[in-house]
């Protein structure tokens, strides 16, 4: 029971934090679906714009994961100096990456719009939201450090605040100011920068007595920075694979032939996102606790933690399967204004693929917790190799099956991709033997 409390202490705040993210996406999709009489075109434009920023943010997620794993192990070992240095390094790297995105926004935007077949609506969205990127990357670094410090409450408070602000400003800008989906982008800028300010203030107040004096030369120590980037090199490769699969999913949907398929796949993917962000709460718990118990050299607690995190992820998966079986049509109707001309066509067409959404939670239960374990153990090579193999399978299945089953091939490829991620990490880690040995 004590371990379950430890898991829930970290998982529940992260679930609350994470569940606000798909809610924000759902609200954005709902706003797009109510902006004019052509829901499919507007939802599709927003989906492409969001996919571009998912590509950018996911490519920066190595900052969060690398910071979290190293910090958690230092926390478990009682190494206050390293935890302080990791915060400084996370902020420094985040600032450099975020500012680079601003400097190179035009070539990045032009390339992204060309690859994704983005129209003028997507372009307006991109060049508005790009100013939120430095803040978003900073939040990655800060939240990674807080996760490593076993603190899920501060990220929860900030996430709720950011998403409430984003939703409120989205309605205000999109409808009252008539800015359309560009208003949703500007709402993100306001919300993300507010989140950075809130996080910085809370961290300063809460941890001011737990920091030790450090120098700039220690922060920029080449040996330590090299270690940080070597760990994150593999995470970057893994992240690129994730970005490629999700971005390709939207791009392939857009190239299927009509706006209805793109709208349907966008909405169904939002339902999967509802599941993924909740299960990710237990992945964060596995991440923080795995690092902590490895740092503390406590193999017994490590085994108990991993086993119970896996059980919790399966429970969540079964819960979502039940929800999707019973209320899938009601959930879909939240996204579309029933007054628009193509609403019933979108919902009826989505029904053809709902079986995949019901099955995916079971296929995806294991990879989430395995990701958390590998991040906490800083086993980045295992994460990289499993992701490369899973991604190769994803594309092979899609291109092989598409001529035979059309859009079903995309969902089949995605389902098997998720399943393989978990299975491969389990076996590449010698059935977790490599993880347990780190705590001995």
Per-region residue spans from a language model:
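Helix-loop interface residues and adjacent transmembrane-helix termini in multi-pass membrane transporters
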Residues: 23-26, 34, 40, 74-77, ...
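Transmembrane helix-bundle signature of multi-pass secondary active exporters and lipid flippases
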Residues: 15-65, 69, 132-136, 226-292, ...
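Alpha-helical transmembrane segments of multipass membrane proteins
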Residues: 26-30, 141-145, 164-172, 200, ...
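Short alpha-helical transmembrane segments in multi-pass integral membrane proteins
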Residues: 1-14, 71-134, 174-233, 290-359, ...
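Short runs within selected transmembrane alpha-helices of multi-pass transporters and secretion channels
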Residues: 61, 129-148, 155-163, 184-199, ...
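ATP/adenylate-binding site constellation spanning eukaryotic-like Ser/Thr protein kinases
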Residues: 68, 109, 161, 230, ...
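Small-residue-rich hydrophobic transmembrane alpha-helices
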Residues: 43-103, 139-155, 264-323, 364-378, ...
């Amino acid at each position: 029971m004590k371990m379950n409390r430890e898991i829930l202490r970290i998982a529940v705040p992260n679930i609350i934090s994470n569940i606000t993210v798909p809610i924000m996406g759902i609200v954005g999709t709902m706003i797009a679906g109510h902006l004019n009489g052509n829901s499919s075109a507007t939802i599709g434009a927003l989906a492409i714009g969001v996919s571009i920023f998912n590509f950018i943010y996911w490519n920066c997620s190595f900052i969060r994961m690398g910071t979290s794993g190293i910090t958690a192990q230092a926390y478990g070992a009682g190494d206050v100096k390293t935890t302080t240095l990791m915060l400084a390094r996370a902020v420094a790297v985040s600032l450099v990456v975020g500012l680079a995105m601003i400097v190179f926004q035009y070539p990045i935007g032009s390339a992204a719009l060309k690859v994704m077949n983005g129209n003028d609506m997507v372009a307006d969205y991109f060049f508005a939201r790009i100013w939120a990127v430095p803040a978003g990357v900073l939040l990655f670094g800060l939240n990674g450090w807080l996760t490593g410090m076993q603190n899920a409450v501060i990220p929860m408070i900030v996430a709720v605040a950011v998403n409430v602000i984003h939703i409120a400003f989205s309605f205000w800008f999109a409808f009252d100011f008539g800015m359309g989906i560009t208003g949703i982008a500007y709402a993100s800028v306001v919300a993300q920068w507010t989140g950075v300010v809130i996080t910085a203030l809370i961290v300063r107040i809460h941890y001011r007595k737990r920091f030790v004096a450090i120098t700039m030369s220690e922060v920029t120590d080449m040996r330590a920075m090299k270690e940080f980037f070597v760990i994150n090199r593999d995470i970057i490769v893994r992240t690129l694979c994730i970005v490629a699969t999700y971005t390709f999913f939207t791009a392939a949907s857009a190239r299927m032939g009509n706006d209805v398929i793109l709208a349907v796949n966008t909405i169904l993917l939002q339902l999967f996102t509802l599941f993924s962000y909740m299960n990710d709460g237990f992945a964060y718990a596995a991440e923080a606790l795995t690092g902590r118990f490895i740092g503390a050299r406590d193999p017994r607690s490590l085994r108990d933690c991993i086993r119970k995190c896996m059980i919790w992820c399966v429970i969540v998966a079964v819960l979502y399967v039940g929800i999707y079986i019973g209320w899938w049509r009601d959930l879909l109707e939240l996204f579309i204004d029933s007054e628009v001309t193509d609403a019933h066509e979108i919902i009826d067409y989505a029904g053809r693929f709902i079986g995949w959404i019901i099955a995916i939670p079971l296929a995806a239960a294991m990879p989430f917790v395995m990701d958390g374990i590998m991040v906490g153990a800083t086993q980045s090579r295992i994460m990289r190799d499993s992701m490369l193999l899973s991604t190769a399978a994803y594309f092979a299945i899609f291109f092989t099956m598409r001529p035979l089953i059309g859009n079903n091939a995309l969902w089949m490829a995605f389902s098997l991709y998720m399943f393989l991620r978990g299975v491969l990490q389990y076996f590449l880690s010698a059935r977790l033997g490599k993880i347990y040995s780190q705590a001995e």
